[in-house]
Amino acid sequence: RDYAALYDYQGKDCANTTRLWFDVGQRLLDEQRDEPGDGFDPMGVHDRILMPGAKAFAAAEYHGTYIDASFFGSMGAMLEERIDANRTALEVVAGEGFNPGSPAQVKKYITESMGDLVRLAVRKGYMRSASAEQSTDRETLQAMIRLWGKDDDRSLILQRIIDFRNDTKVLQTNVAGLLGKMDDDHRIRPSFRAGFAAPDKKHWFVEVDYAQLELRVAAWLSQDPAMIEVFREGRDIHGEVAVAMFHKPADQISSGERYMAKRVDFGILYGRSAKALAEGPEMDYLTDELGGERWSVEQAELYVRRFLEGFPVLRQWMEDTAKNAIRDSFVDTPLGRRRRFPYITRAGVGHTRRQAVNTPIQAVASDLCLEALTRISARAHEFDGHVLFAVHDSVALEIPKARLKEASKILRYEFEQNISIDPTGIPFSCDIEVGSNWGVMEKVK
């Protein structure tokens, strides 16, 4: 190995990064001094949040995450068997040598055997637009399956194409990809969750996850008393929203209705429009898995309106935040970030308004997670644990079984109490789950 070349590269990398810092750091200081707004604090974000977080992630990457090679090996064999079975079955109907992974071949097969029906699916609203006729992506194939029904022979063929593509991608990306990146100690260093495991029987794989973090942040930012009351009393926020959306008693809310209420909850906060909700992938899950009916854009608009009617103070905060962003061309977050909107066109006003509302919610939630990870990384030695990685608003760790009780107390404290904002009576809660691997977990009470 040419370590001399590596040393030379790393030295230049560090030297050039340092030179950049003097330039970029000065720009941040100048912006903080010259730009309007009391909440803008780029150097504070850098010093308090980003640099400590970078060190915590570096430590996690250095330690690595143990993966179960035998699990992924077995999964790879199973996927290869399914891929071969689907390829063989499809060759029977589409001809020898047919490649389900080739968009051109799939398009040719569909055009020759189902072309007129693709146009029918567009006209009946199962596809978004006529451009879908030229596509063979998953969404288009699923739209045709919905048109004909799952048990139709044509649907079974299309489902085999979908399964072939999915299994091939999973095999190449997740199984072979992970095994190819595994080091000699069975760790990788940057569903398959069962392949991410505790290294031995003396350790737990642990995940700490904020509960409904964005919604709690929205309640904190807006100080909406109705939302705050739901969280204080430990009620089900998604169930409450479903009652308001569908005008039904709580005991009559179906799993599909609660699921869609959850999508509306988070969709509004994530800056999604009613049209995006009506045309989103959750509609496939609602119809295919939960037996519900697809929404029209008008229905989605009605449900969004009902959600906001249930939380009027949140609605006013959203309106004020959006107005100020249009006026100022930026929005600040309570922890010092700023998002700029330098080019607001008439056609893009709606998008800008949604992003202005989404930014402080997402930014605060993200910063709280990063700060929690940083603090936990600094304290993990107290229970002989290691931070492995973070996913969305959760942190994964490796903890000795004998130290789980004291570790849980520290984790709950850092996630729920030792946070950088004053929650003003809104409980920020987390769930802790443990298991021998990421696929089989139980909650710690």
Indicate residue ranges for each PLM-predicted region.
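Conserved catalytic core of nucleic-acid polymerases
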Residues: 55-62, 243-383, 387-390, 398-401, ...
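Short acidic, glycine/serine/threonine-rich loops at helix termini
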Residues: 111, 217-220, 440-444
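Flexible, glycine/threonine-enriched loop-and-boundary segments that flank and lead into catalytic domains
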Residues: 175-189, 371-384
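A common structural junction motif
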Residues: 413-422
